[in-house]
From Swiss-Prot:
Entries under Gene3D superfamilies matching the protein: Cytochrome c oxidase, subunit VIb (1.10.10.140)
Any single GO CC term annotated in Swiss-Prot or TrEMBL for this entry: mitochondrial inner membrane
Gene Ontology biological process terms in this record: oxidative phosphorylation
Descriptive protein name: Cytochrome c oxidase subunit 6B1
Gene that encodes the chain: COX6B1
Lineage: Eukaryota, Metazoa, Chordata, Craniata, Vertebrata
Motif residue range(s): Cx10C motif: 54-65
Domain CHCH span(s) in chain numbering: 27-73
Length: 86
């Protein structure tokens, strides 16, 4: 168990700097990467491409966004009430 946690910590990477979001408040960065991931996933699925190219966006939004936000957004997408354009 301890070795598994050490491996996770060793391989953990935070979101890199994004010049579109230079300020401390990273809410917009979180939102944009969430949208970008799902747009990428939708586009790659439509083209029959490999979805793994979208994993970078997923890693970034999972690093930046609170889990409760992501859960709420996923539920809203499933219900068709999500406010973003994907």
């Amino acid at each position: 168990m301890a070795e598994d946690m050490e491996t996770k910590l060793k391989n953990y990477k935070t979101a890199p700097f994004d010049s579109r979001f230079p300020n401390q408040n990273q809410t917009r960065n979180c939102w944009q990467n969430y949208l970008d991931f799902h747009r990428c996933q939708k586009a790659m699925t439509a083209k029959g491409g490999d979805i793994s190219v979208c994993e970078w966006y997923q890693r970034v939004y999972q690093s930046l966004c609170p889990t409760s936000w992501v859960t709420d957004w996923d539920e809203q997408r499933a219900e068709g009430t999500f406010p973003g354009k994907i």
